[in-house]
Structures are given as C-alpha cells and as structure tokens.
Design a protein with these regions (language model features):
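Periplasmic c-type cytochrome electron-transfer domains
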Residues: 36-44, 138-142
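Bacterial N-terminal signal peptides
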Residues: 16-28
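N-terminal secretory signal peptides that target proteins for export/translocation
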Residues: 1-13
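Sec/Tat signal peptide C-region and signal peptidase I cleavage site
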Residues: 31-35
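Extracellular/periplasmic catalytic domains that process cell-envelope and extracellular macromolecules
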Residues: 53-56, 83-85, 102, 179-184
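C-terminal cap of thioredoxin/glutaredoxin-like
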Residues: 146-223
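A short beta-strand-turn-helix
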Residues: 41-59
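Structural alpha/beta surface segment adjacent to cysteine/selenocysteine redox centers
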Residues: 62, 67, 73-148, 215
Length: 223
C-alpha cells in the first residue's frame, strides 16, 4: 500500500487555468478506507466528539463523503431531500479516498466555490456527482470546473488555492474522519441533542433515513 500521494493538476492550454497540488499526504492511507458498495459494516466510533448537531439544532445529518465515490453520488439526492424536508442541517465532511485520482482536488474546488457562496459550493458538489461518470482524470475535472465556473459567472484564478488554506481544510476533514473511525464513504449519521437516547445513529439502510430522522426529532423534543 502506497504511503505517499502526489497530485499535480496543470493545464497549459490557452485560456485554461492552473491548479497545482502536491501533497505528502501519508495520513490518507493510515486507515483502510474504501468506497462503499452494498451494505457497509457498522463504523466503530473512536472519537464521538464531532457527532453532534451544530449549535442551535436539535437534529442534523452528518456525512463523510468523497466526490468521486459512486455510492456518495447515489446518496446525495436523498440526503439533500431529507435536509430540505425536515429543515435540519446537513453537515458535509470531505473524506477523499486515496484510490481516487481526482476526489481530493474536487473537494478543494468545492471549497473555492464555497468562498463565493455556500449554495454555489453545494451546487458544484451536486454537479460533480451528477456528472461523475464523465470525469475520469484531473484534466477532465479541470475542464468540468472551468465550464461550471463560466456558467455561474465566476472567474477562476490562475491558482485556485495559492496559500493552501482550502487544501488544509480538506486535510483537516480527513484527519477528523480518521479520528472518528471512518472506513468507507459515504458514512452517514443522524445526530441529536437528546441526552436520554443515543446521541448518534449510523444510517446503514438509507431506506430508513426518514424513519431515523423522525425518531431523532421525537427523542430530542424538549431538549
């Protein structure tokens, strides 16, 4: 198993832009992360401190996702629907798996669009998932990102993350996932502020997602 990940995202085409990302990211392979196909095993939670709703919320969806993961793409519309239906936060964490060649850069790109507006960043994530099958390389991701930016009236800079801040945020999310105990994507929890019931429940069967949210809202009522 590789212990070093180096990504370089370059374009010399006229009118293109340059994204360069070289990472000595050994931490990426510290856990045997894998994309989820079929029912995943229950995640053994090592550090539950991140599995709680944001301030002011009784219930939330927490997801660790990889933008190149096919099952994350499958889950995305349902999670979006659930968050809107119940008007609860959907907290999305980046967990780019090391076997995927463009997911890390896609996460950085999404955070760039977040700096314009959170809605735009989430629209980019949605579009990446919807077009995932047509994106195989970093160059294709670059072309897709350029088109997305153009459609939404955003000028992409020569370097999308010149100070490395967005890159560090993705790495921090990955490290958080490692501390929690993430081993597959997507990993999804329903978390609650209730003190008399389990504070988080992993969603292993997405067909029960709404049922789990209903139960969490009932349990947290009055808290």
């Amino acid at each position: 198993m590789h212990r070093f990940l180096s990504l370089r995202f370059l374009s010399s085409r006229p009118g293109g832009f340059v994204l360069t990302l070289t990472l000595a990211f050994a931490a990426l392979l510290a856990v045997p992360a894998r994309a989820q196909f079929g029912a995943p095993p229950t995640t053994h939670v090592n550090d539950p401190s991140a599995l709680k709703p944001p301030a002011g919320a009784r219930v939330a969806i927490i997801e660790f996702e990889d933008l190149e993961c096919p099952d994350c793409a499958n889950a995305n519309p349902l999670l979006k629907e659930a968050a809107a239906k119940y008007n609860i936060p959907w907290v999305r964490h980046d967990f780019p798996l090391p076997m995927h060649n463009w997911s890390f850069q896609a996460a950085v790109n999404a955070r760039f669009f977040d700096t314009k507006s959170k809605t735009l960043g989430n629209d980019y994530r949605d579009e990446v998932f919807a077009n995932q099958i047509s994106i195989e390389t970093l160059d294709q991701l670059q072309q897709f990102t350029q088109r997305f930016a153009s459609v939404h009236g955003v000028a992409l800079p020569f370097a999308i993350d010149p100070m490395g801040r967005l890159t560090q945020e993705v790495k921090d999310d990955y490290a958080l996932g490692q501390r929690v105990g993430i081993e597959h994507t997507p990993t999804i929890w329903i978390v609650t502020s209730a003190t008399h019931a389990p504070p988080f429940v992993e969603v292993l069967d997405r067909g029960r997602l709404f049922q789990l949210i209903d139960a969490a809202l009932a349990e947290s009522r009055g808290h």
